[in-house]
């Protein structure tokens, strides 16, 4: 039960990172634009008073503010895309769903008189104190905030994952597959809006009561508890879920424009813009002292406690991790260096983090952030606005550094903790990050994860690879650490490997390898051993010379579709080349061209051809049909055979194959189009086997 819940929470946590990743850019625009309009700043830098400079400053501030004003919509889109493995259709569905949900709530609220229908009265209504309602994207509606966006995003993703391969009757074929998702999402969002009218008001009332009581009862204790829990969740990657309500939904503030703003971070940005006294930032400011000073001091303590022969190695590891923490506030590379080998140190660190939040609250210092508590955000939201006692972070940080340094050194010696550089000789194997070649790292990580076949789901956030594997026993955690992971967390079949800011790039490289788009720089194995390598062999160098008109016929009878309708991103994203797809109504596949057979996959589900004119074509029958290992497929050609248009290549038992694969949609891909060439579909609806003029290659 816990493992399943952890997997779900992990997915939601990484999905939240997509909209959150937008905020630093918006925050920079807002902070700099506001600072350029600050009266104290203008007195020092007189050129800022120029009308043109002030115009630019106003534009920058507005450009940043619009992002924070529309966070619910951004969360709806970001969460949907994140939970749908990056597919943009889910994002479109989320936009439609969010608009429909709000319009449906608005219609009811206007009809029953809760919100005035008269525009003048409605404008007055929103300038008064009605925090339960908001004018979102011009729609007078219930104030569901970021939670409303997240709910719609989850709904859109669930519907996408359920229906993106749906097949409808032929007369409704245009609306099949991914096109069906926005339709079903809009209907579901209409129902969701009506449900939210009933369930959300008491939920909102409870959230308001909780957040108000939390601050009024004992804000200092609340800040301490927040800091401890937020750090404690770092190993599980669930801290995003914990802090999101505090940053984006709890608490409220009425802006100068009369708008009700919710969430510690959003309120801080609004108060910066309004030029009022800062009251927000309690649940952000505490990060600066321990991220900029405390953890780097902990790194120094670990270095000083390392064995003399290991100090040079530890200096490199700890130095880079400490610098990363100081500049950017990314702390995982440093935290995970001692989390698993010395959990007691991490427990101490969590308490110190809570202490940092508590002290900054007692001093009433308010500094917001968009990314994390490093020097960059400290300058943008503390020093540049100059609206709070930002300088107090430095003495508090230095004091915390002393506590971290001596606290860590005492604990390491007292409990003989095996922090980096203090391992027993038997444990001191390869140095972290040492691999044969830099370009081999993603391959080595895949092997340490149990190879490609063991990867069920692959994703990443800012600091860690998040992998769901089929068999966790095949994962070599020690090897992952040797490859540079500062920590590896395992909960059931969910693996998190902490590679720091490189994680997202490594994920992309690993996805390329899994998709067969980046051949390993070493001798290839037999083509019979790996289907993925055979796909690579089909992808040739682009054509350099123009090809005259060739006879090209439909290889299958069925319904023709653009290749973007294929429910597989390798094909729909045109990663192997442009083309088209056919949803078969019968199981016979014929040659579309005159030429030769380049490749017949061992599983018989795909064939590569080359026309006499040099065009190379891949016919891939169905999606994930490789898993059938040839069952239901009969091949009538072999590699090197000459073929004519209409000659039989394959016969497929549709009744046997269809129930066992996600879709029968068959992509036909031109894998070596010249630069600038694209495939356009001339036919529509159903096409017959051997039918000519169904597609055209254009420049």
From Swiss-Prot:
GO BP annotation list: D-glucose transmembrane transport; phosphoenolpyruvate-dependent sugar phosphotransferase system
Top EC class for this record: transferase
Coiled-coil parts of chain: none
GO MF entries: D-glucose transmembrane transporter activity; kinase activity; protein-N(PI)-phosphohistidine-sugar phosphotransferase activity; protein-phosphocysteine-sugar phosphotransferase activity
Subcellular location: Cell membrane
Gene Ontology terms: cellular component: plasma membrane
Entry-linked Gene3D superfamilies: Glucose Permease (Domain IIA), Glucose permease domain IIB
Protein name, as recorded: PTS system glucose-specific EIICBA component
Designated gene of the protein: ptsG
């Amino acid at each position: 039960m816990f493992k399943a819940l952890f997997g779900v929470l992990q997915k939601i946590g990484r999905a939240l990172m997509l909209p959150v990743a937008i905020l630093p850019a918006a925050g920079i625009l807002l902070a700099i634009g506001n600072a350029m309009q600050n009266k104290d700043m203008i007195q020092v830098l007189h050129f800022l008073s120029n009308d043109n400079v002030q115009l630019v400053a106003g534009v920058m501030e507005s450009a940043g503010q619009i992002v924070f004003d529309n966070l619910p919509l951004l969360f709806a889109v970001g969460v949907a895309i994140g939970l749908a493995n990056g597919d943009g259709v889910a994002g479109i569905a989320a936009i439609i769903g969010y608009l429909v949900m709000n319009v449906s709530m608005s219609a009811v609220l206007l009809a029953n008189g809760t919100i005035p229908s008269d525009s003048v009265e409605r404008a007055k209504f929103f300038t008064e104190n009605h925090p339960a309602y908001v004018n979102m994207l011009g729609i007078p509606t219930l104030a569901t905030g970021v939670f409303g966006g997240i709910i719609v995003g989850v709904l859109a993703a669930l519907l996408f994952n359920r229906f993106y391969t749906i097949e409808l009757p032929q007369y409704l074929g245009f609306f099949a597959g991914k096109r069906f998702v926005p339709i079903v999402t809009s209907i579901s969002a209409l129902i969701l809006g009506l449900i939210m009218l009933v369930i959300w008001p008491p939920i909102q009332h409870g959230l308001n009561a909780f957040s108000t009581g939390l601050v009024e009862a004992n804000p200092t204790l609340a800040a301490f508890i927040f800091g401890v829990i937020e750090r404690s969740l770092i190993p599980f990657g669930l801290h995003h879920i914990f802090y999101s309500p505090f940053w984006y939904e709890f608490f409220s503030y009425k802006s100068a424009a009369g708008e009700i703003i919710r969430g510690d971070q959003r309120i801080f940005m609004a108060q910066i813009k309004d030029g009022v006294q800062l009251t927000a930032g309690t649940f952000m400011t505490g990060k600066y002292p321990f991220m900029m000073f405390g953890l780097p001091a902990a790194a120094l303590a670990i270095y000083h406690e390392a064995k003399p022969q290991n100090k040079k190695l530890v200096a490199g590891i700890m130095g880079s991790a400490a610098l990363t923490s100081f500049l950017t506030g990314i702390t995982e590379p440093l935290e995970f260096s001692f989390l698993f080998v010395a959990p007691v140190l991490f427990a101490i660190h969590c308490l110190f983090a809570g202490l940092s939040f508590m002290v900054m609250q007692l001093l009433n210092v308010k500094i917001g952030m968009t990314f994390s508590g490093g020097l960059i955000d400290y300058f943008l939201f503390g020093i540049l606005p100059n609206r709070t006692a930002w300088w107090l972070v430095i003495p508090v940080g230095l004091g915390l550094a002393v506590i971290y340094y001596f606290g860590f050194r005492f604990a390491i010696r007292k409990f003989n903790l095996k922090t980096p550089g203090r391992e027993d000789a038997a444990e001191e194997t390869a140095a972290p990050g040492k691999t044969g070649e830099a370009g081999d790292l993603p391959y080595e990580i895949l092997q340490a994860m149990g190879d490609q076949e063991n990867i069920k789901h692959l994703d990443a956030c800012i600091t860690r690879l998040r992998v769901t594997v089929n068999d966790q026993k095949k994962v070599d955690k020690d090897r992952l650490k040797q490859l540079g992971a500062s920590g590896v967390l395992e909960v059931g079949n969910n693996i998190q490997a902490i590679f720091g800011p490189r994680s997202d790039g490594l994920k992309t490289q690993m996805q390329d390898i899994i998709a067969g788009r980046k051949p390993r720089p070493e001798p290839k194995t037999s083509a019979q051993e790996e289907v993925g390598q055979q796909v690579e062999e089909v992808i040739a160098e682009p054509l350099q010379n123009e090809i005259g008109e060739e006879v090209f016929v439909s290889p299958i009878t069925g319904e023709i579709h653009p290749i973007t309708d294929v429910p597989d991103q390798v094909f729909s994203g045109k990663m192997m080349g442009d083309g088209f797809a056919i949803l078969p109504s019968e199981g016979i596949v014929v040659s579309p061209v005159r030429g030769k057979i380049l490749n017949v996959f061992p599983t018989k589900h795909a064939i590569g051809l080359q026309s006499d004119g040099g065009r190379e074509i891949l016919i891939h029958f169905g999606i994930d049909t490789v898993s059938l290992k040839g069952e239901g497929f009969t091949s009538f050609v072999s590699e090197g055979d000459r073929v004519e248009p209409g000659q039989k290549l394959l016969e497929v038992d549709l009744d046997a194959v269809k129930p066992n694969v996600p879709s029968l949609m068959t992509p036909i891909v031109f894998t070596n189009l010249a630069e600038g060439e694209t495939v356009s579909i001339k036919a529509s609806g159903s096409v017959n086997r051997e039918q000519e003029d169904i597609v055209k290659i254009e420049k």
